[in-house]
């Protein structure tokens, strides 16, 4: 089974979600019946390089994603990579997918924070709309 993963949170300076992915992936790569492919904006961190050294392919956009608007351009890149990689599963670790993905693969999303969904009044209208339309 081929699993493509959005590893952007692991690309440069991982914290929180990036470290979650790092720890989870270190365990998953022990399963020989799974092939992993990472997609990232950049591959600068020691963590992502350690997966490259273990033979995991990493496809990078070549420029860091800094702002929310940059995520849309990044996902255009992700969409193209998924067409080339042809995974069985695409795993989005970052909660949102801002573009419509189509393909012969299943999509798995990890939701780390339910507060914006459950307690809308604390996050404001813009964040609420962004979260709802990108999930």
What are these regions (language model features)?
Residues 1-135:
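Carbohydrate transferase catalytic cores enriched for Leloir-type hexosyltransferases
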